[in-house]
Amino acid sequence: MKMAKSANEIGFITCLVVFLVLTGQSNGMSNGMPRTVPCIEGRILWNRTLPCSSILCGDHCVPHGYRAGTCDIVNDRAICKCSRCR
């Protein structure tokens, strides 16, 4: 009887460990390192019909690892291009 009880406890602990490992990976437990998009010179951050300015574009480019951004109007669309990788 004692042997069966300890075998059940080992099985329960094994299942618990497997469950924690699987749920930890699916919930992003491995997100310790941030995923960064490689810095590509001239990357288009957004392309939209709203008006834009180079200041607004630059404010959006800085958190993505760039030093500046420029706003160009092409075919009545505002295109924000990031430049000067950090």
Curated annotation (Swiss-Prot):
A single GO BP: killing of cells of another organism
Disulfide-bonded cysteines: 39-85, 52-71, 57-80, 61-82
Q: Which domain of life is it from?
A: Eukaryota
Q: Where are the transmembrane segments?
A: none
Assigned GO CC terms? extracellular region
Q: Which UniProt keywords apply?
A: Antimicrobial, Disulfide bond, Fungicide, Plant defense, Secreted, Signal
Looking at the keywords, is Transcription regulation present? no
Q: Which residues form a coiled coil?
A: none
Primary localization class, coarse: secreted
Q: Where is the signal peptide?
A: 1-28
Instruction: List where in the cell it is found.
Output: Secreted
So what family is this one in? Belongs to the DEFL family.
Please report the name of this protein according to its UniProt entry: Putative defensin-like protein 189
